[in-house]
């Protein structure tokens, strides 16, 4: 009685690595975009809006 060889292990591992890589990459990119980038952009936009309001009041 022989045991059947295990097949498809490398293919499964490669697919799992690719899926995991894209998933983690997407999560980290989303965190960077919404957690860091948009915070900086909102601060900059707020500064320029206040600056424009001050210039508008001076004139």
Swiss-Prot record:
Keywords: Cleavage on pair of basic residues, Membrane, Mitochondrion, Mitochondrion inner membrane, Oxidoreductase, Transmembrane, Transmembrane helix. The keyword Protein transport does not apply. It comes from Saccharomyces cerevisiae (strain ATCC 204508 / S288c). This is Cytochrome c oxidase subunit 9, mitochondrial. Component of the cytochrome c oxidase (complex IV, CIV), a multisubunit enzyme composed of 12 subunits. The complex is composed of a catalytic core of 3 subunits COX1, COX2 and COX3, encoded in the mitochondrial DNA, and 9 supernumerary subunits COX4, COX5A (or COX5B), COX6, COX7, COX8, COX9, COX12, COX13 and COX26, which are encoded in the nuclear genome. Component of the cytochrome c oxidase, the last enzyme in the mitochondrial electron transport chain which drives oxidative phosphorylation. The respiratory chain contains 3 multisubunit complexes succinate dehydrogenase (complex II, CII), ubiquinol-cytochrome c oxidoreductase (cytochrome b-c1 complex, complex III, CIII) and cytochrome c oxidase (complex IV, CIV), that cooperate to transfer electrons derived from NADH and succinate to molecular oxygen, creating an electrochemical gradient over the inner membrane that drives transmembrane transport and the ATP synthase. Residues 45-56 are mitochondrial intermembrane. Residues 57-59 form a propeptide. Its main location: mitochondrion. It is found in: Mitochondrion inner membrane. Belongs to the fungal cytochrome c oxidase subunit 7a family. The chain crosses the membrane at residues 9-44. Present with 35500 molecules/cell in log phase SD medium. Residues 2-8 are mitochondrial matrix. It is a single-pass membrane protein. InterPro entries: Cyt_c_oxidase_su7a_fun. GO terms for biological process: mitochondrial electron transport, cytochrome c to oxygen; proton transmembrane transport.
């Amino acid at each position: 009685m022989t045991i059947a060889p295990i097949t498809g292990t490398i293919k499964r591992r490669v697919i799992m690595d690719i899926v995991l890589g894209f998933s983690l990459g997407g999560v980290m990119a989303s965190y960077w975009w919404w957690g860091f980038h948009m915070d900086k952009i909102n601060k900059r936009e707020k500064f320029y809006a206040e600056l424009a309001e001050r210039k508008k009041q001076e004139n």
